[in-house]
Amino acid sequence: MISVGELVEKLSPHAGAIGGVFAALLLGLFLAFQRKEDRKVLDPVEWRSFKLVSKDHLSHNTALYRFALPRPNDSLGLPIGQHISVAAEIDGKQIVRSYTPTTLDNDKGHFDLVVKTYEKGNISRYLSLLTIGQEVRIKGPKGKFVYTPNMSPALLMIAGGTGITPMYQIIKSSLQTPGDATKLSLIYANVEEDDILLRKELESLRDSSNSRFTLYYVLNKPPSSWNGGVGFVTKDMIENHMPAKDVGDERVLMCGPPPMISAMKGHLAQLGYPAPRTVSKLEDQVFLF
């Protein structure tokens, strides 16, 4: 395809003949056509490679990885609430793990992954060792949950550790969408204060939400000056910091370590919520990522 520079070069010698206004009009039409060519680059079957362009350490064991898309106007093409598969060949075997980007499709030209590195985590360690310019292979979208504006009057979200990523994506999308009135509440549990991921971003969303989004942190090992929740997430915390259960068709979304999720199932059962399925479906009132 001809570039903008090539088009200008071709038009320049003839500008006097066809008129500067006409040349400008052609250039404007060309640029408009280019903008319409915004592409969604994900493929559910074919693995595609994307280059690492930056790495920002959020904590001692967690980083935000930014990968470039092929063109500045490209978007990933990921429905809100879904995730991607990341693959790598490790010790002669292809290893695949799922991650939810923290970027939305209106973030053009790149996508971001927030990943915690585990000592025995194959893909997380692989990502941590990537250098700028190296590539990863991904495909997608994957997942059963797709967020749409006003799909429920309230979303009650409980997250632990890196389980924050699908919640953050949903919260960010909801608050940026005109006409979406969904009430959003998040209980976010971690071990220590330094483990709280995307804290600045979450608090910025809360502060600009006109009280539509509430945020409550819980720490297992809090500092002496801590004013949030202490220990593990309890039934009382859910009752006190989630929207009132009488709002109607509210939904509960959960993502976190298995022991935490097991405990949350018990709390929710006591509060009258149905038991989640092993593999959650979009229509479920309690959805596990």
Question: Language model features by range: what are they?
Answer:
Residues 164-178:
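Histidine-anchored nucleotide/phosphate-binding helix
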Residues 140-151:
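A short, basic/flexible loop-to-alpha-helix module at the beginning of a structural domain
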Residues 26-40:
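Cytosolic-side junction of a single-pass transmembrane alpha-helix
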Residues 152, 175-184:
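Conserved S-adenosyl-L-methionine
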Residues 154-156, 251:
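Structural motif
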Residues 1-28, 185-289:
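Reductase modules of NAD(P)H-dependent flavoproteins
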Residues 81, 163, 257:
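Short, conserved phosphate/pyrophosphate- and ester-handling motifs at nucleotide-, phospho-/glycolipid
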Residues 37-134, 190-192, 203, 220-221:
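Ferredoxin-reductase
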